[in-house]
Amino acid sequence: MKTTRREFIGATALAAGGLIAGNAAAQGSPFYRGALLHLGSNMWGDYPAGPDDLAKSAEEEKTHPNPISPSGSPTPYHSYLQCRDDLWRQSVDRLAAKKMNLVFIDLGEGIAYPSHPELAVAGTWSVEKTRAELARIRSLGIEPMPKLNFSTCHDSWLKDYHRMVSSQTYYKVVADIIADVCAIFDKPALFHLGFDEEVPVAGKGLFHAVYRQGDLWWHDLLYTVKQVERNGSRAVMWSDKICDGREAFLARMPKDVLLSPWYYGTNFSEKNLAWDASYEKKNGTWEVQRNLAASFVALNDAGYDLLPCTSNWSRDEAAEALVSFCKTRLDPKRLKGIYTAPWQRTIPDDKKKHISKTLEGIDLFAAAMDKHYPL
């Protein structure tokens, strides 16, 4: 984290032609198969006072436990990095062993942003360390792509800016950080922006809950997408916003955005694939997501490029079900790949599975891909 802003800009000056390079990479991209892995994890929960007031290590947390959130359990937000280097490398190496070619890296508090060093926590990776790992990942035949979640229900990694959403200060920070990341990643072909689950039900466990809707949500989304595009990458985002209102989503979502529909169940029956508009206004409960499977068909039929995501979060059979569905029902010209998201911090197993759940998720997804999309 010793890199100054001036040094950082100087070191990346040779990438000034990245707009062309990034777009060329996106246009000539392979069929992606990979996973979302967590370097940062402050995308859930938040803090009652200052973002740096919590324990700075796992050892300190034993005597200074995290505060209880409104959900009744300790907040999952941490003032230190929840990623162990050896387990991170083990996860990436498993992707390589399974012949995956894509890893979305959920960054959050995981890396230093030269424009905003205040976003670091104890253990945050320096720019130099991040670049070294990106080079190692590429040497394994895997394209590392960044992910930052700008959903107001998943953006506690922004620290105090998490509480300044839609302000001029916020917009500047968004632009600064995206520029930093595109430079660190050397103009990645894809840049995942998250933007999922920005609904009232998702904020019930937060100390500070806010969500955008209507024109403001669209303004902020399109502003964020523009920052990605001006830095030479293609924006990727979760597409569950369609569940709030299909017609409005299809009317306003640009086709340049690569949509990532997700569904972690196994029910791809015709009944479950039929859109039920009655769920669109139920964003006070998780029933609002009852059209997740149906959204694949809606987006496919509307002509969007898709990068679907599965997970072993709740069902080990989910990868097989989703990959099989993609193979038989989605337009191959619009399907840009498939990936899995185990949704685990990169830490040792404790009372719950963490690293083992991640590795199992990669294995389950690889088996499904080998069956339906053999290399």
Region roles according to the model:
Residues 1-3:
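Secretory targeting signals
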Residues 5-6, 43:
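Short, cationic motifs built from Arg/Lys/His that form the positively charged side of catalytic pockets
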Residues 27-229, 233-236:
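Feature activates predominantly on carbohydrate-active enzymes
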Residues 101, 165, 184-188, 196-370:
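Catalytic-core regions of glycoside hydrolase
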Residues 7-26:
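N-terminal export signals
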Residues 8, 35, 117, 304-306, ...:
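Hydrophobic beta-strand residues in large extracellular and virion-surface proteins
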